[in-house]
């Protein structure tokens, strides 16, 4: 867990105090922060300026933004909890009429981390966005295709640093399936390369995400929840 960048530890303590009170006076916030009066005044002013705290007469209270932010606090440790990334993972399927094979739209990643690794397209869920909207947007942005998606389950993957044992990634992928789409495939995009490949071909691919087969199978079989942990070395990540 780590404190969110930009907030002083004293400001975190003030937010924590306000989390459990409808309003609080200056003396109560000073006691919670453990700082001298002038320093507390500075930090309260900063929180007001950031929009986390409102001043009501001689008292202070959390704003709507402040309530949402403070709700992420680990109240025992007094820090903002680090949370998994939420993203969609797109499994886009087609039947090739020439080869009579089932193919999947896959990407070669040309940016860090996982440079040159092959896998299914993914994308972060934006604030306030539905999963279907995210899947549709990501497909259009990265491939030029327009598709219709259905939700298939959750794939929770943690990545552990092989040398240190530290968890370096924690991701909640919403599995989204599509076999109805239109448009012309955009082969190159900023940070990657698109291609239709079969699962048989991917079995021979030396550089693919370690969870590739698991996540594809989870989506195709509509498994509600799949959780895995994989080790990656410095050279792989």
Annotated model-derived regions:
Residues 23, 35, 99-141, 145:
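Conserved Nudix-box catalytic region and its N-terminal flanking loop in Nudix hydrolases
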Residues 59-89, 166, 236:
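Acidic, metal-coordinating catalytic segment for phosphate/diphosphate chemistry
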Residues 33-49:
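Short amphipathic alpha-helical interaction segments
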Residues 125-149, 156-212:
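Unchanged
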Residues 5, 17-37, 187-237:
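Nudix hydrolase/Nudix homology domain
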Residues 76-119, 147, 177-180:
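N-terminal strand-loop-strand
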Residues 1-14, 36, 74, 80:
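Short alpha-helical segments that sit at the start of domains
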């Amino acid at each position: 867990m780590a404190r969110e960048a930009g907030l002083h530890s004293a400001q975190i303590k003030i937010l924590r105090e306000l989390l459990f009170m409808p309003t609080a006076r200056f003396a109560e916030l000073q006691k919670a922060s453990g700082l001298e009066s002038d320093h507390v005044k500075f930090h309260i002013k900063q929180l007001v300026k950031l929009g986390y705290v409102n001043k009501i007469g001689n008292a202070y209270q959390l704003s709507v933004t402040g309530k949402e932010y403070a709700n992420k606090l680990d109240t025992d440790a007094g820090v903002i909890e680090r949370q998994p990334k939420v993203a969609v993972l797109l499994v886009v399927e087609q039947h090739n009429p020439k080869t009579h094979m089932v193919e999947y739209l896959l990407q070669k990643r040309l940016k860090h981390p996982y440079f040159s690794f092959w896998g299914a397209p993914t994308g972060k869920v934006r604030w306030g966005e539905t999963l279907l909207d995210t899947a549709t947007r990501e497909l259009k942005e990265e491939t030029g295709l327009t598709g219709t998606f259905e939700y298939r389950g959750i794939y929770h993957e943690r990545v552990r640093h092989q040398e240190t044992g530290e968890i370096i990634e924690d991701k909640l992928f919403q599995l989204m399936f599509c076999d109805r789409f239109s448009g012309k495939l955009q082969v190159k995009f900023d940070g990657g390369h698109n291609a239709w490949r079969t699962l048989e071909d991917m079995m021979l691919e030396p550089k693919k995400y370690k969870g590739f087969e698991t996540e594809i199978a989870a989506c195709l079989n509509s498994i509600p929840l799949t959780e895995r942990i994989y080790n990656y070395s410095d050279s792989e990540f």
